[in-house]
């Protein structure tokens, strides 16, 4: 690692700001959504998450090498946990949204926590595959649109909406 005491320090120097951007952009979208009036949330859920996904996609393509290092080479550092962190944030957001649906008189059936974790993890892995495999940006944009339609329909079905 030369100038750095550890892989962790090296990765902090190379990818730290990019990891923080992706993580913080996702958190910001979750917070913006949670701060909306309850009645408005079902109407704009897909819009806010879509904007966030495209923002992260474009950012990752602008910083492709660094983002690929996070996704493919960060084992043994805190950066390897990016997807797991995003999954936990999404799980919490899903539970908060279920509370909103209950408040609106549109309760969601119980979702098995293991299934919920598997589906959300799969969703993020699917998204990040676009970056890992360096899909042409136009293709990646189309794939994100299709993935959003697929996952939105699935979640709406599971949530009884």
Could you describe each region identified by the protein language model?
Residues 34-44, 103-107:
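Short helix-coil transition/hinge motifs at the ends and kinks of transmembrane helices
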Residues 19, 43-65, 121, 125, ...:
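Amphipathic alpha-helical segments that line or abut small-molecule/effector binding pockets
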Residues 70-87, 139-155:
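C-terminal/domain-terminus segments
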Residues 21-32, 66, 122-130:
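Solvent-exposed, amphipathic alpha-helical segments
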Residues 2-5, 9-35, 47, 51-55, ...:
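Alpha-helical structural segments
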Residues 34, 38, 57-77:
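Amphipathic alpha-helical segments used for helix-helix packing
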Residues 51-62, 76-103, 113-121:
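Amphipathic alpha-helical packing segments from all-alpha helical-bundle domains
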Residues 97-150, 159:
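Hydrophobic/aromatic-rich alpha-helical bundle segments in the mid-to-C-terminal region
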């Amino acid at each position: 690692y030369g100038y750095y005491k550890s892989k962790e320090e090296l990765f902090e120097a190379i990818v730290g700001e990019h990891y923080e951007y992706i993580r913080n952009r996702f958190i910001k979208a979750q917070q913006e959504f949670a701060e909306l009036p309850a009645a408005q949330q079902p109407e704009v859920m897909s819009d806010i998450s879509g904007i966030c996904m495209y923002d992260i996609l474009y950012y990752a393509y602008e910083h492709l090498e660094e983002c690929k290092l996070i996704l493919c080479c960060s084992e043994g550092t805190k950066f390897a946990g990016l997807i797991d962190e995003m999954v936990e944030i999404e799980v919490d957001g899903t539970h908060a949204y279920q509370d909103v649906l209950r408040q609106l008189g549109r309760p969601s059936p119980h979702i098995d926590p293991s299934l919920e974790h598997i589906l959300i993890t799969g969703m993020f892995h699917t998204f990040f595959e676009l970056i890992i495999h360096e899909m042409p940006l136009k293709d990646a944009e189309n794939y994100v649109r299709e993935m959003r339609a697929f996952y939105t329909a699935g979640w709406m079905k599971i949530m009884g909406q």
